[in-house]
Amino acid sequence: MPSLLIGTSGWAYANWKGPFYPEDCPRRRYLEYYAQEFPTTEVNSSFYHLPRAATYEQWTAQVPPEFVFALKVSRLITHHKRLVDVEEPWRAFVDRARVLGRHLGPLLLQFPPSFRCDRPRLARFLASACRPAASDPPLRLVCEFRHESWFTGDVYDLLQRHGAALCIADSPRYPRRDVRTAEFVYVRFHGRTQMFASSYTDEELTKEARWLKRAAQDGHDLYVYFNNDARGHAVENAWTLRRLMEGRRRKKTQRAGGV
């Protein structure tokens, strides 16, 4: 049965105290509390620096066995080197990521909007990155392109050949293409009218739920993350979409204020 994992991009937001976290919840327990509400999160800090192994170990100690961390790949790989001569930093990133063990989810490669399509370069990277050591479980890779030139049939075919997913990213700033290229679907909701700041309406989320249900019926695992973290919109929208997808009520929890 396909997995349905809906969560938010990150959890350590100070302005979520009150709207989401109880007022008496210390910051060190945010993840533990978050993991009672959601089955997954997308880690953004890994984009800026390589987390320590001890950090990953601390995280896994705070979440249930089935909890999943999706990791945003280092900007050294996607922005600075732009997939050129990245064998060493890629291996370092992946080796560290595997400390998460069963909790490791997809790895998101978010490319800058100034990075135009270079299919041969992407092909060389995927050929190497999607070939793990025999003893390692396969990785789920996701590509979020932000330049229009990447959205072509040739690029989709390349992703499909390597089992990598095209990130379906909803935002007011960058192109969106609802194209499935892998056995799983990866969606990022950045905010429809304001990047990172606007909330989705119930009507908008109902429409999104329809096509996501079709993807699930086709056997695709679903990873869905809300990146509109301002004022707690992400948690509200994540719960609404989950309710629409699963036909369930939100579970009752003790908290100061409601989301």
Language-model segments: which ranges?
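Residues lining hydrophobic/aromatic ligand-binding pockets adjacent to catalytic sites
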Residues: 1-259
